[in-house]
Amino acid sequence: MDIISKSGEGNKYTINSAIAFVAYASHIDINTTEFSKVLSGLRDFINDEAIRLGGKISDGSFNKCNGDWYEWLIGIRAIEFFLESETNFIVVKMPNATSFDVMSIYKSCLSEFIYDLRSKLSLNNVNLITSNPDFSIIDIRGRREELKSMLKDISFSNISLSTISEIDNLYKNFIDYAELEHIKSFLSVKTTFRPDRRLQLAHEGSLMKALYTHLQTRTWTINPTGIRYYAAATSIGNADVIGLKTVATHSITDVKSLPQSAVDEIFKINSVLDVDSCLSHILSS
């Protein structure tokens, strides 16, 4: 299978992101390589193939694939972490919002409240437009052994297209699954925190918390555990720390509630060890 394919006329090629990822992973030890170096190595690997074929790859193609590759790196290690530990939580990669609504993870009796909210807002010419966090951290008490058996072959030492498919489709096992407290938190990841990405994350975190509060209100849940929203990138600067402390807007509309940050914490995830450290902290919070 080819890691790149010709795109129309001329010398432009597109990246077959999963095939390229699997092919490159067979040449390196991801367990000991910084993720930023994996991404730059993939770029060189693909560009070398494009040059060999007399073609070129656009920066836009790499930008799209970088996000996929970074999520697969984190997603695969997160499953390894689950298999190696005794945790009752699993980190599930979410698809794009255009193909799946993250609220569908909740049981239908809960998600229907969100659909009802959307419908009522639309009557007032207002749209509830949400993006999906990249990962949901879900309580799987009672299903641990089933999931361990299902996911036992996922490993950096054995990456295949089947591995990628399992990571990408794991969410299907959790549709109509969660009670209000079963989703512990969300994690969204970017290779880098550009200013526009910081705004996107703050908006997403604020909205996820507002929707949780809406469900809490509709179900009359007293003293809920709440939901947390985290962000991560291969590197973090002071501007990122400050920018992602933006307030969750729903928390300043009621004087009886304490202000909340849209993003609870940010993490540097640039290696397997960073993934482990991040997940250990999130699961103990």
Curated annotation (Swiss-Prot):
Family matches, as Pfam families: Bse634I
Cofactor: Mg(2+)
SUPFAM superfamilies recorded: Restriction endonuclease-like
Keywords: Endonuclease, Hydrolase, Magnesium, Metal-binding, Nuclease, Restriction system
Co-factor binding comment: Binds 2 magnesium ions per subunit.
Residues engaged in binding Mg(2+) 2: D134
Protein EC: 3.1.21.4
Gene Ontology terms describing biological process: DNA restriction-modification system
Residues bound to Mg(2+) 1: D134, E204
GO molecular function, one term: type II site-specific deoxyribonuclease activity
Top EC category: hydrolase
Catalytic activity as recorded in UniProt: Endonucleolytic cleavage of DNA to give specific double-stranded fragments with terminal 5'-phosphates
UniProt subunit comment: Homodimer.
Protein name in UniProt: Type II restriction enzyme Cfr10I
Protein's organism: Citrobacter freundii
